[in-house]
A protein has these predicted regions:
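A short, gly/pro- and small-residue-rich
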Residues: 66-87
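Short, structured coil segments at secondary-structure junctions
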Residues: 22-23, 75-76, 92-93
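C-terminal functional extensions of proteins
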Residues: 89-172
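Solvent-exposed alpha-helices and their adjacent loops that cap or buttress functional pockets
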Residues: 51-55, 71-74, 89-91
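Short, well-ordered beta-strand core segments
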Residues: 59-60, 78-79, 97
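Short, acidic/turn-prone active-site loops that include or flank metal/cofactor-
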Residues: 31-33, 84-87, 102-105
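Long, charge-dense
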Residues: 1-45
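Active-site glycine-rich loop that binds ribose-phosphate moieties when present
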Residues: 34-54, 60-67
Length: 172
């Protein structure tokens, strides 16, 4: 579903065309199809397609604003957010937060999903039930803090890269 803060018909068409070229068979949220609204969301991102976000039980968000994340959670949606900042409103409001860059996360997330395909429904429900986003965010902050302390004591700052495992490894 296309959902833009700065919405225009031209941008929607271009993004929809790009999504179709990438393999999407159905693209929601274009033009008048974005006819519903998320309550408690004031930005243009409140406009949604009633066949998409409103019907979904689980929503994957990247580059999101905290108001929409909160609104989706109030609608009892499972919200999975990809966010670089574990202190952002989106990260704090989401059901599950993956703290990393969305470009790096997507292939890793796809691999994790493939691994979980053979898992029983009962085990998946238990995995979800036992997941604690607050604990995850705390671990991410600990990782970032320890990494910053290490960088402050070495010349690695100039290299400026995350370790090979990245943050996604500890948060998926």
């Amino acid at each position: 579903e296309i959902n833009l803060f700065h919405r225009s018909a031209s941008r929607e068409r271009k993004i929809a065309a790009h999504m179709r070229r990438a393999g999407a068979t159905t693209v929601l949220g274009v033009g008048k199809d974005a006819s519903a609204s998320l309550l408690e969301t004031l930005s243009n991102r409140r406009r949604v397609d009633p066949r998409g976000l409103l019907k979904a039980d689980t929503v994957l968000l990247a580059l999101e604003d905290g108001d929409r994340t909160r609104a989706l959670r109030k609608m009892d949606k499972l919200v999975i957010a990809v966010d670089l900042n574990p202190l952002s409103r989106t990260a704090q409001e989401a059901s599950i937060t993956i703290v990393d860059n969305v470009i790096r996360v997507m292939p890793l997330l796809c691999e994790e999903i493939k691994k979980l395909r053979s898992t029983t429904r009962e085990d998946l429900v238990e995995l979800l039930r036992s997941y604690d986003n607050r604990t995850n965010l705390s671990k991410c902050l600990d990782f970032i803090s320890s990494r910053l302390k290490k960088l402050a004591k070495t010349d690695e700052v100039s290299e400026g890269s995350l370790p090979e495992e990245g943050l996604a490894r500890i948060s998926i």
